Amino acid sequence: MPATPQLQLICTDFDGTLHSDFTEPAVPIALQVKLSEVKAAGTQWVINTGRTLEDLQYGLDKANLSVHPDYVVVVEREIYRYEGDEFIPHNEWNERCAAAQAALFAHISDRLPEVFEWVNLHFTASVYEDQWSPFCLIAGNNPDADEIQKYVEKKFADEPLLSFVRNDVYARLSHAEYTKGTALKEVARLLNIPCEGILTAGDHWNDISMLQPECAQWVVAPANAIPEVAQYVRSINGFIAPSDCGLGVLEGLEWALNDI
């Protein structure tokens, strides 16, 4: 008979999943206590976010957590190990990722001015370049973001390695092989943890790559997850929590622990 699965790794999105800007505390105390308990029993925890490392550090400091992650994934792809008060980069992965991104972005660079021009002509939106992507978007609203996404994806339909990574009205172009899902798989590889020992929790489009059965045994969406994520999680027999954000993650953790 197969061995009983054990919860070895918890992977949570940050904004809208672990953390809420609209509650005090931003991460429920009960969830912090539960994370401390499972970590004390040997389970590891990774925060997997679209935030930059600097923005995540700010959010963690402001939340004043009593428990800390073992790893973080930032800008949906860069991996850092948290040790003491330092974030230690996983250089092999991060450098390989940066090289792949740079090559892809150089390949499409001459096509981007037309995209910027089209967005600025048709929408009130912020489009800009930063060190992680040559095309970043803050749309005025979600319907505008929908239209911009359709245009960009059609424009680059001949570039299968290019992905439009979106969270609400925020988006960036990225390399399709470096996602929250592939970064989670790399963390699991480093820790020698099979997908059968992993729980993932997320609420938005950019979380779907890590909410795959090939990534995790237990897949959780809080009650505030967007309809597309909730529908997907339901379709794979994952757990739709009754509560929003961190309380929903806590409910998902209890669901997984009761399954063991």
What kind of feature is each model-predicted range?
Residues 27-120, 124:
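Active-site phosphate-binding/coordination module
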Residues 39-40, 157, 234:
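Anion (oxyanion) recognition and catalysis
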Residues 5, 173-174, 181-260:
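Mg2+-dependent phosphoryl-transfer enzymes with acidic/Ser/Thr/Gly-rich catalytic loops
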Residues 9, 71, 197-199:
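Structural motif
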